[in-house]
Amino acid sequence: MAAKDVKFGNDARVKMLRGVNVLADAVKVTLGPKGRNVVLDKSFGAPAITKDGVTVAREIELEDKFENMGAQMVKEVASKANDAAGDGTTTATVLAQSIVTEGLKAVAAGMNPMDLKRGVDKAVIAAVEELKCLSVPCSDFKAIAQVGTISANSDETVGKLIAEAMEKVGKEGVITVEEGTGLQDELDVVEGMQFDRGYLSPYFINKPDTGSIELDNPFILLADKKISNNREMLPPLESVAKAGNLLIIAEDVEGEALATLVVNTMRGIVKVAAVKAPGFGDRRKAMLQDIATLTGSTVISEEIGLELEKTTIEDLGHAKRVVINKDTTTIIDGIGNESAIKGRVVQIRQQIEEATSDYDREKLQERVAKLAGGVAVIKVGAATEVEMKEKKARVEDALHATRAAVEEGVVAGGGVALIRVAGKISSLTGENEDQNVGIKVAIRAMESPLRQIVINAGEEASVIANNVKAGKGNYGYNAYSEQYGDMIKMGILDPTKVTRSALQYAASVAGLMITTECMITDLPKSDSSDLSNAGNGGMGGGMGGMGGMM
């Protein structure tokens, strides 16, 4: 086992604070509408340019191991805030730095670290309750667009695109961000349920100009098995031959069964198309059941004793329209029962709560979106690849922020909400004087985001902070236009969830750092190669002497 380097008390805390400051100082320059960019060197390709706090934090590793421990603990604050709300990482870092700095000053002055932490925790619990009281719902197009604009670094186009996407696919719909091919940002909305499976034969195509298949009011047959012989295929075909079009979604359709479908289509006897079921294994079974719920059909599966030969028209589902191309199938306006669809969505949401892997959670959320609304894709446009990556990261942040705003509402932005909360809990007291100091540490930290926004805008932080504190309600300072006024009326909003998460995670990690008394790390390894080289050199000299003797 490697030897360890151990530091105690003030020596440990000073080193830790130095690491905290290096990381926080790099991150906090990005805060606010006039925050600056940070350029990150990459081992290959062009440097990355970002204004995203967590991206900057993740890049930082310090040479001194004790300092690095401090930096890594604050990095955890940014990562946790990002995971919980998708934004507010810089705010969380600024709050953590302030709590750690003021807290360690109090520890150095002889305060009890555990009571300080209890005081900080007490203040944060009270602050979170006050934040909930200040929060207002965010549901209309304008408010959603404003939240998106603020989070995307005052880019109004991005804010409007996100609001438009939410309006079209609903708040539960999936909105993804992709790199576009042009200079302009675009919004592409897929209504209905779409999955990544195309037609099994190009002979089904009935729209040669677009290379796609369009079926109006088709019946839909779902089969959890491979279909390969005519005997299985004929009953459903005969059922719909006179009634209309047919879409078959099965594990696979091959051999003579596929040939029969192609011949019937080409002769115009029945308009039919076949696609493979989406997903694999258990996920395929679940997605077939989703489609069944959406279209009012029954999945023909031998596991539940249903056979294709005995399929009747009652087992088939129905949709207003189906569009199939070589890569995707889109089912529009299925006739499934509304309450059954809602029940299915509730069931999948429960699975999301219980899911342990991010991949499973993401796939389940996609299924909810396909059942509940649709899918929107925001295609980000830019002139260069470097700009594209930076802009895409900003749009993703803005999307997370708007989702958080819809979930828990919004508060006045620009650090004003935390200033108002600090004012409301200023009379809070602890069980002893040390806890009171902890409460004051937390209250002072709540001013730090506003102060940093003002510093980044090149103004005097103390003057503006005092002016904002003297005001009431949503009165604050717009660093972008350099004006005072009602922040909500000026469209400067922060999602309540983002502000809450930033405060809670900052206090949690900072509280642990305040109560640190000892730090342990591996001793740096001595350069043993120099020693071995020296030894070899000595032997060489000896051998030379022996040669002389001979």
Curated annotation (Swiss-Prot):
Give the record's keywords alphabetically.
ATP-binding, Chaperone, Cytoplasm, Isomerase, Nucleotide-binding
Which is an annotated Pfam family here? Cpn60_TCP1
Which gene name belongs to this protein? groEL
Instruction: Report the main location listed first in the record.
Output: cytoplasm
Kindly provide the name given to this protein in its UniProt entry: Chaperonin GroEL
By sequence similarity, the record places it as follows:
Belongs to the chaperonin (HSP60) family.
Give the protein's function: Together with its co-chaperonin GroES, plays an essential role in assisting protein folding. The GroEL-GroES system forms a nano-cage that allows encapsulation of the non-native substrate proteins and provides a physical environment optimized to promote and accelerate protein folding.
> Which of the seven top EC classes does this enzyme belong to?
isomerase
Which species does this protein come from? Buchnera aphidicola subsp. Thelaxes suberi
Catalysed transformations (reactions): ATP + H2O + a folded polypeptide = ADP + phosphate + an unfolded polypeptide
Which EC numbers characterise this protein's activity in its record? 5.6.1.7
Could you tell me which PANTHER family the record lists for this protein? 60 KDA HEAT SHOCK PROTEIN, MITOCHONDRIAL
Any one GO CC term of this protein is:
cytoplasm
What is the protein's quaternary organization?
A: Forms a cylinder of 14 subunits composed of two heptameric rings stacked back-to-back. Interacts with the co-chaperonin GroES.
Q: CDD domains, from UniProt?
A: GroEL
